[in-house]
Amino acid sequence: MCFTSCSNKGGKLEEIEKQVNKIALNTANAEPIYKLYPTRNMWNFLKLDTRNGKISIVQFSVEDNEKQFEYELSNKALCENNAPGRFILQPTENIYNFIMLDQMSGQTYQVQWSFDEEKRFVTPIQK
């Protein structure tokens, strides 16, 4: 954006332009609120709310809309009112397990996804 073609009393327009550009740059570099992580099952992803650690399982299909769904894996927020990018997921060698890292506290969690609701969980890894 350029405001300098307008009247510029006291250099205020340049200052406003600098502030707008700074906000635009910060917004462009901002961490996303949600991230999709592929699983080794080609039809399934984990959707992570990077602010609070909530996770859902997302399945897509190229043939049938009834095979598309999103299920909650963990609907419990691990923290409140945090900035995007706090939590990340790292895949493991096990197809159903990920490690979740709280990048602020260093706490790690074992995340297990499954089609069977009883086998889904997020649990802290003890230090």
Question: Where would I find each of the regions flagged by the language model?
Answer:
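A low-complexity, Ser/Thr/Gly/Pro-enriched, surface-exposed linker/loop concept
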Residues: I57-G85, T123
